[in-house]
Amino acid sequence: PTLSWAVRDLGCSGGICMTASHNPAPYNGYKAYGPDGCQITSQAAAAISAAIAGTDAFTGVKSMDFDGAVASGKVKWIEDAVLERYYDAVLAQSVNNLSDEQIAAAPLKLVYTPLNGTGLVPVTTVLARAGVSDVTVVPEQEQPDGNFPTCPYPNPEIREAMQKGIDLCEQVHPD
């Protein structure tokens, strides 16, 4: 969601996310986003495919050194300031209307698993800023790993993918 949001925030023509997603490892790759921050439609993908098919791979492809593309502004990294705005935007959508004192008086205890994806830093950052400091992370699924060694189909909608998190819940008894 960070890149999708950043495409709109930065006014980009599009974005590409190299991803491990929440799909099995053979489906890892990239996701292309349009200027609206949404993944491109099948129509847009077909138009891109047609343009690629109509291009001579030896003479019709424009190329640029990566460092030169960065220096010219054609390639942009998502910088910390963009991430900070993203975290602020996520927090602004929060339904939490409790004061800091109320949060401190009734702390929330959570178990979280990023399923070997990239959610650890943004999720724990937003939770901490919302006053949630007691977060136990599933250790085997904490670090990003596109091979997903702990669950072959790391989609949180599939119960088996969440089994390690469920097991940890039974040990630490979160709220």
Model-derived segments and spans:
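Short, high-confidence coil segments that cap the C-terminus of an alpha-helix
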Residues: 11-13, 172-175
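Ferredoxin-reductase
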Residues: 1-38
